[in-house]
Amino acid sequence: MILVTGGAGFIGSNLVAGLEESGAGPLVVCDRNGVGDDGRTIAKRQLEACIEPEALFPFLDTHRAEMQAVFHLGAISSTMETDASLFARNNYRLSLDLWRWCADANVRFIYASSAATYGDGAMGFDDDGSKAALAALRPLNLYG
């Protein structure tokens, strides 16, 4: 079983399509936008389940033995959102908790970050993970 958080989004839905076409699966999407208009991106996919974020950890615990990999693409990406505690809970804390769950369950965790961390690009685009390079990043908003 492969889980894709943010699987109803643009990148996530394309990943789900590619995984399905390659025969990987069963596939599970975790996304708040899995229903309604945003759900059209995954409506034609053969999914084992489409779950809300609030159901994520109970679902993982129930399917622990079946889980092969987690692609973590889910996040609040709105550049207009200004609630720092919401970002901390949904983007940072959830990512950390999901990574810990995967590490504990020995499940592969694939995380996609965002170019938003670089800011306007004035400092260039470098994946240098040193403290100095990370301190130089100037994201334009809370998402970055």
Question: Where do the PLM segments sit?
Answer:
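Glycine-rich phosphate-binding loop and adjoining beta1-alpha1-beta2 segment
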Residues: 29-56
